[in-house]
Structure formats: C-alpha cells, structure tokens
UniProtKB/Swiss-Prot annotation:
Its main location: other. One of its GO terms (molecular function) is lysophospholipase activity. It is an enzyme of class 3 (hydrolase). It comes from Bacillus subtilis (strain 168). This is Spore germination lipase LipC. GO terms for biological process: lipid catabolic process; sporulation resulting in formation of a cellular spore. Its EC number is 3.-.-.-.
C-alpha cells in the first residue's frame, strides 16, 4: 500500500531557507509517516514562494491538483505568512492597526474555503483522510502589534479544527523564544532545525483519521 500525501502552500511548503541539500518539513514528515505506518509515502507538492492565501486557494481549481487531493490520505497546508509580511510592511508605513484585522479575517476565510473545497473534491463517502493546517509563528518578535495579531489569528484558526479531518499544527509555540535557533539567515523562513521542528509538530498530531493508522 502507498500513503498519498499532498502538501499545499507557500515558501514553508517548498522548504525555502532549509539549505541546498536539506529537506523542508514535507519530506521530513513523509519520512516519519513511512517509519510509523510501515508503508511507502508518495508526496505531491503544490506550493510556491510568495503565494498568499487567495493564491493557495486558487491552486485547488487546477485539475491535476484536484486529482491529487482526491487521492490524498494526508493533506498539509501552510499559508498567511506572506499576507502577514505584507500587512507588517503596510502597518510600518500607515500605522493603521485595522490592517491586521482585515488581513486576519481574509486569511481565515480563505482557509475555510480551502477546507470546504477539499471536502467538495473528495465528494460523498470519501476514503479516510486528514488535513493538517499550520498556524503562524512570529518572525517579528520586536514588533509588538505583529505579536498580538498573530496570537489573535492563531486563536481564531483553532476554530477550523471543529471540521472533520482537520487539526492545527502548532508552529507558533515551537518557534517562540527560539527564533534565532530556528530561523534562517533571512530572519523569516525556517532553517533546517526549524523545518525539523515543524515536521515534529505535525507528526505529533497522529493519523487516527486514516485507515492505515
């Protein structure tokens, strides 16, 4: 049997910052599933650096992406980091705190749409599957308002876990206080240690939704 894993998202899903020959969290998590479940994992990645949540949602309209989603046992999603960076830059210019609440609501709405779209693609009576959505870590601990916004956003994101199949992987807690250790030289993306920590965060959520677990 092959476990099919589809990863959607932004630069975190591509593994940006991990180093030339070092994998991001996707390959690491795939390897963990292989070891735990004693089955081969086939991975499909649909992600690009710079994508915002609206663009990640748009990936789900492509026929080949839909096929991979339909077949997937495990789905992971990263997103909203680029929306966050854009809003921080806009705030530094305008000092308008409502930017964060607008971006937060927009991101959350897009995550809800992604989960609904996955359910629509899966159709009625699908095979067991799991969705893991990463919350946001804070690459800007020196900007107070960014920290408040991320905490609020992550709290709101937890409501997604009320949907069947969905659990939230906690990147925020594992990066808090370890930014220097877990972030790459650009100060935004994880390094190899950071991606290992992300893989462990999603791994510890288990696979009880899957028939192979």
């Amino acid at each position: 049997m092959v476990l099919r894993y589809t990863a959607l998202g932004d630069s975190l899903t591509t593994g940006r910052g991990s180093g030339l020959f070092s994998p991001g969290f996707v390959q690491r998590f795939g390897d963990m599933m292989e070891a735990d479940l004693k089955t081969r994992t086939a991975i499909n990645i649909f992600a690009r650096s710079g994508l915002n949540t609206e663009e990640i949602l748009g990936l789900l309209s492509y026929p080949y992406v839909q096929k991979c989603i339909r077949d997937a046992d495990m789905i992971t999603i990263t997103g909203c980091g680029n929306d966050l960076i854009d809003s921080v830059l806009a705030y530094q210019t305008s000092k308008d705190e409502t930017i964060f609440s607008r971006v937060s609501a927009h991101c959350h709405e897009n995550f809800e749409k992604m989960i609904a779209k996955v359910a629509e693609i899966k159709g009625e009576n699908p095979s067991p599957y799991a969705i893991r959505v990463f919350n946001l870590y804070n690459p800007f601990p020196e900007i107070d308002i960014a920290g408040k916004w991320i905490t609020s956003f992550n709290s709101h994101l937890e409501t997604l876990a009320s949907a069947p199949h969905v659990k939230i992987a906690d990147a925020y807690s594992i990066f808090k206080g370890k930014e220097q250790e877990y972030l790459s030289f650009d100060g935004v993306h994880p390094n190899s240690k950071g991606y290992q920590a992300m893989a462990e965060a999603v791994h510890k959520l288990g696979y009880k939704e899957l028939s192979v677990s």
